[in-house]
């Protein structure tokens, strides 16, 4: 048994530079002299020898005899391709530098037009690399970007580029669609804060052509440069939509953005929509990458801006006829075409027509009504566009002083930053859903709304319920009377909770909502806000917001209970 050392001996002893074979096998503390103390004590001093350390494969074989000859006898060194020009270097300093590249040639495949011939062990060769050829290590480390000196100008769109390793590093199509929520949020906020839109540019933009303005949303020349592009297609389009709050432009027709069935959409995103790869002949890419690009073009939805004539809000004077038509044509009972799901059948039309809450509240009064009557999915992008239009009205105005305009503009920018912090997550959660999934989410919302309306009837607190966009879907009669409104007037058309708040309360609400929209699963918020009556009087309320989330943990319904402060 090994003698137990005292603390002083343990402190004074020093490890040996290299242990002997016996001490190494027995895990003993060896000494520097030979034979060591352990071998002398055990009468095996004649066999006390230093342990031979293993050589790392990529190191030279100067310390181990025969290492080079063993490597040259391996089958890998017998593989040959076309010859490479070599030159003999007489310098001794070059000899030591060339030893490592020759030994490490097995780790990387040689170029197609080169090979390594068997060299005599007495000679040291230097491989001549042409100055124009790029080392493979640089190609592996450089991100997929195009050389700006070989870009095609927009004046000659029919000119083709010869894609070579000297002027182009082949981009990976998937690299255009990868990003994180934190990075994309930071990009959006930086873009929104750095862009300075003046009143004159807004007025001139409002009177110009719609297609031209859609291009101006990217840059004044109609193309985004490398520094102005986000790393996500969704964030590029998201920034365009948020920037529309300031740029009053005539937007393109919105297309379904939260479905994956966009094959018939001619406005789907493609790599050619980016300015830095425009006019590139993508036929020069290999076939697998072209298939990936085509798959992304067919599967990614397109986020467009604004209203068109057929989707614009109707005149309030014709609301009765308009909703009667919606009741007759768009919401029907169970069909008679055999058994099957009455909600999802062959006659169901997935449209973006808006159905006001006054109709849905009267149509779905029990849980069985959700299954016996046809249900339509809710088109959230159109609701966000209506919110955009409302925010421009609330924080706009030409009869204000420059100080008041600047104050309203600063509040608008705060709201923009808060929306940009959570909206990309909402899009990412719903972008791969099909129409049936959206119907399921709407059915979940309507089913939860039935329970909350029954609870509101048993509760004495004035209550308002709205979607995550702020669109009101239910209000109690006592709350409507406090605000000098009719509940039917607030539900017969698209109305937002922000229409009933003052400017500071709107900013406070978005601050609170942004904190619980993503990540934070807190379901109850207590605060105090000011509400506007129909006669423009302000009433201060203390309120409690209850958040109901969907299966993606995204806010689905916000239930606000208000108590006036006397």
From Swiss-Prot:
Residues 63-92, 250-270 are annotated as: Disordered. GO terms for cellular component: nucleus. Its main location: nucleus. GO terms for molecular function: DNA-binding transcription factor activity, RNA polymerase II-specific; RNA polymerase II transcription regulatory region sequence-specific DNA binding; zinc ion binding. Transmembrane segments: none annotated. Residues 20-48 bind DNA. It holds the Pfam family PAS_13. The keyword DNA-binding applies. The keyword DNA-binding applies. It is found in: Nucleus. Coiled coil: none annotated. It comes from the Eukaryota. Residues 253-270 have a biased composition (Low complexity). Belongs to the ERT1/acuK family. This is Glucose starvation modulator protein 1. It comes from Candida albicans (strain WO-1). The gene is GSM1.
């Amino acid at each position: 048994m090994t003698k137990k050392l005292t603390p002083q001996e343990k402190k004074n002893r020093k490890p040996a530079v290299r242990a002997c074979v016996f001490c190494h096998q027995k895990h003993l503390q060896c000494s520097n002299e030979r034979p060591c103390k352990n071998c002398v004590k055990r009468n095996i001093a004649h066999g006390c020898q230093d342990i031979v350390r293993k050589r790392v494969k990529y190191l030279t074989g100067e310390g181990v005899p025969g290492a080079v000859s063993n490597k040259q006898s391996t089958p890998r060194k017998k593989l040959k391709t076309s010859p490479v020009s070599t030159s003999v270097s007489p310098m001794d300093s070059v000899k030591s530098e060339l030893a490592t590249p020759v030994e490490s040639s097995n780790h990387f495949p040689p170029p197609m037009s080169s090979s390594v011939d068997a060299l005599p062990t007495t000679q040291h060769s230097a491989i001549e690399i042409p100055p124009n050829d790029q080392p493979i290590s640089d190609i592996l480390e450089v991100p997929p970007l195009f050389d700006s000196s070989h870009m095609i100008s927009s004046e000659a769109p029919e000119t083709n580029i010869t894609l070579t390793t000297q002027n182009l590093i082949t981009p990976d199509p998937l690299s255009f669609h990868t990003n994180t929520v934190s990075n994309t949020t930071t990009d959006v906020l930086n873009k929104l804060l750095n862009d300075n839109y003046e009143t004159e540019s807004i007025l001139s933009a409002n009177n110009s052509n719609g297609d031209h303005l859609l291009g101006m949303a990217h840059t004044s020349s109609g193309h985004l440069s490398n520094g102005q592009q986000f790393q996500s297609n969704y964030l590029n389009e998201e920034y365009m939509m948020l920037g529309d709050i300031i740029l009053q432009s005539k937007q393109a027709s919105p297309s379904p953005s939260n479905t994956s069935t966009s094959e018939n959409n001619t406005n789907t995103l493609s790599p050619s929509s980016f300015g830095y790869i425009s006019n590139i002949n993508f036929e020069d890419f290999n076939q697998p990458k072209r298939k990936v690009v085509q798959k992304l073009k067919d599967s990614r939805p397109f986020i467009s801006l604004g209203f068109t004539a057929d989707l614009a809000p109707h005149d309030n004077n014709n609301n009765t006829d308009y909703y009667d038509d919606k009741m007759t044509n768009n919401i029907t009972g169970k069909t008679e075409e055999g058994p099957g799901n009455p909600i999802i059948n062959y006659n169901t039309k997935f449209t973006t027509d808006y159905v006001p809450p006054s109709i849905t509240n009267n149509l779905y009064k029990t849980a069985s009504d959700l299954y016996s009557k046809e249900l339509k999915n809710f088109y959230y992008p159109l609701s966000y566009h209506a919110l955009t239009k409302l925010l421009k009205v609330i924080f706009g105005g030409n009869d204000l002083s420059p100080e008041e305009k600047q104050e309203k503009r600063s509040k608008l920018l705060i709201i923009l930053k808060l929306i940009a912090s959570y909206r990309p997550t909402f899009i990412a959660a719903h972008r791969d859903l099909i129409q049936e999934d959206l119907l399921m989410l709407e059915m979940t919302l309507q089913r939860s709304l039935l329970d909350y309306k029954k609870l509101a009837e048993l509760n004495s607190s004035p209550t308002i319920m709205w979607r995550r966009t702020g669109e009101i879907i239910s209000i109690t009669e006592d709350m409507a009377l406090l605000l000098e409104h009719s509940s039917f007037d607030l539900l017969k058309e698209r109305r937002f909770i922000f229409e009933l708040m003052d400017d500071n309360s709107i900013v406070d609400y978005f601050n609170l909502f942004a904190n619980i929209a993503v990540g934070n699963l807190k379901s109850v918020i207590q605060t105090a806000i000011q509400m506007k009556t129909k006669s423009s009087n302000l009433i201060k309320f203390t309120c409690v917001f209850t958040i109901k989330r969907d299966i993606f943990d995204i806010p689905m319904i916000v239930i606000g209970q208000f108590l006036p402060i006397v």
